[in-house]
A protein has these predicted regions:
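Membrane-interfacial entry segments at the cytosolic side of transmembrane helices
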Residues: 30-41
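Ser/Thr-rich, Proline-interspersed low-complexity disordered segments
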Residues: 57-87
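Feature marks short, highly hydrophobic, charge-poor N-terminal signal-anchor/signal peptide-like helices
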Residues: 1-9
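Extracytoplasmic/lumenal domain signature
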Residues: 87-90, 95, 103-124, 132-138, ...
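C-terminal motif of bacterial Sec signal peptides marking the signal peptidase cleavage site
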Residues: 49-52
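Alpha-helical transmembrane segments
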Residues: 15-28
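Conserved P-loop NTPase nucleotide-binding/switch module
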Residues: 182
Length: 500
């Protein structure tokens, strides 16, 4: 099948919003465990080598110089606004704190030591990054429950169960059982609501908006679109709030079973109106599954990474890519490596890491191939049109940034990469190979983790300042910083660490 230029308008039926109680799965950070283990073994080799909705109605616009294919539902009244920023200096209201996914907060102390403050056992595993809103830590579980905890001691302030998670027996494959809320929620200071997508029995994916003050559900709607099999699609990437909309990325289950096609769905924050959807124009796969979900710029445009698709020759199917989408999910621009077809065939695509937005209109991405790319956000470059390409590492998860310095979650150790004013990459330090978790930065310290230990690294040198064994951690979890505390999800709940 060849990818053709098309803009498909899908009339999302208003009945979707009224189906009521339904059923989702937030497919977060533990996808592809077998494949992740494979990349752990292949990563060093890569570095060595690199160093020497159905019922659619279709029209066909012409867009040059790229062939851009978009699938979007009609959305009425969507007005671009500035992207979300934290409500105050200590809040952490979305994945990696802001829509650029910097993962950086300046006003925190650098540690002499790390100590465990408390742990809370909840009703399921936590893959989503915790949020911090005022004096509440918001935690989402695979039990389909949202919790507000006291950051001082972990006491439950409120908890709201929004459905019954999907058991293993109802899933064709996967590696998170049961499946409940996997992707990181987002908080909207304008409405006071925390938004999450839950996978519930049925199956269906449900968007809920919960009052941060008391846990009351104020918004609830099904966010599966026409032609989408809820059993085959997993919602694991973080939600993004921009333009008065909640953007929801979908990929497939671990094992890539059944017929799924990567897509991003948008709902108005009030839960009203039709859904928007962009669907990758491939016959199968091309999941949008990376932990960070979509990044957003100041104009409300979205940047989302896409995994390998079914096409391995002929015309590009817009998989193995970075896509730039408008607030109404029309395809504006795209990038793919020149080797996209071979990367699709070998499952060494860009979809394992989220897009990183940098100053000077640059974008950084690395994935499973070991190559890092810098792109211009104003002209992503189409096929092979990068600004710079270098051997960086095999990367899974979300990178953190401080200005034009990037801290990349490499499977052989977090790596510092500096991008100059011309977009050229300069490789800096690299941490020990067991420190590979998606990093965040507080003050002058980078925090990352191994399978069971949190590490504090000097931002300039990568030297380990402090570490703490916190017990088993889920794959692709991301810590959250608030003041002198760090919060991280576990297989049974959440652990709080004190910076001392």
């Amino acid at each position: 099948m060849t990818a053709t230029s098309a803009l498909t308008i899908v009339a999302a039926s208003s009945s979707i919003a009224l189906i009521g109680l339904a059923v989702p799965l937030l497919r977060n950070q533990a996808q592809r465990p077998g494949r992740f283990a494979k990349w752990m073994g292949v990563g060093l080799l890569c570095m060595i080598v690199l160093s020497s909705c159905s019922n659619d109605t279709t029209s066909t616009p012409t867009i040059t110089p790229l062939v851009l294919t978009a699938t979007a539902t009609a959305q009425q009244g969507a007005t671009p606004t500035a992207t979300t920023t934290p409500a105050n200096n200590t809040d952490w209201t979305t994945y990696h704190r802001d829509n650029q996914r910097t993962g950086y907060i300046a006003n925190t102390p650098d540690p002499h030591n790390l100590t465990k403050a408390w742990g809370a056992q909840l009703d399921g595993a936590v893959y989503a990054e915790p949020l911090v809103v005022g004096n509440r830590v918001i935690v989402a579980t695979e039990g389909d429950t949202l919790y507000a905890l006291d950051p001082a001691n972990g006491n439950v302030l409120w908890h709201t169960n929004v459905g019954t998670p999907v058991p293993q027996s109802d899933l064709p494959c996967g590696n998170i059982f049961p499946l409940g809320i996997t992707g990181t929620p987002v908080y909207d200071p304008a409405t006071g609501l925390v938004y999450a997508v839950a996978e519930v029995t049925g199956p269906a994916h449900i968007l809920v908006g919960v009052d941060v003050a008391n846990g009351q559900v104020k918004v609830r709607r099904v966010v599966d679109t026409d032609g989408m099999d809820p059993t085959a699609h997993q919602q694991r990437g973080a939600l993004t709030l921009a333009n008065g909309m909640i953007y929801i990325p979908y990929g497939g289950l671990d094992g890539d079973c059944s017929d799924y096609i990567g897509r991003i769905v948008a709902s108005r924050a009030d839960g009203q109106g039709p859904l928007l959807v962009y669907r990758v124009p491939t016959p199968r796969e091309a999941g949008m599954w990376a932990t960070p979900g979509a990044s957003a710029d100041a104009s409300g445009n979205l940047y989302v990474s896409v995994g390998n698709g079914a096409i391995t020759s002929g015309s590009w199917d817009h998989s193995d890519s970075i896509l730039k989408l408008s607030p109404t999910l029309q395809l504006l621009d795209a990038f793919a490596p020149s080797s996209w077809a071979a990367e699709n065939a070998g499952d060494v695509d860009l979809g394992s890491q989220g897009a990183v937005l940098l100053p000077n209109n640059f974008v950084f991405i690395a994935g499973k191939s070991g190559t890092g790319y810098t792109l211009r956000s104003t002209a992503l470059g189409g096929i092979g049109g990068q600004v710079d390409a270098q051997g960086v590492c095999v990367s899974f998860g979300g990178a953190a940034t401080v200005g034009s310095t990037i801290f990349v979650p490499c499977i052989d150790g977090v790596r510092q990469v500096n991008v100059d004013a011309n977009g050229k990459m300069h490789l800096g330090w690299q941490a020990s190979g067991n420190i590979f978790g998606s990093p965040v930065v507080g003050g002058h310290t980078v925090y990352s983790h191994s399978n069971d230990t949190l590490y504090a690294l000097n931002m300039d040198s990568g030297q380990v300042i402090a570490s703490l064994n916190v017990g088993q951690l889920n794959r692709f979890v991301t810590p959250t910083i608030a003041g002198s505390n760090i919060f991280i999800g576990t297989p049974t709940g959440i652990t709080a660490i004190s910076i001392v």
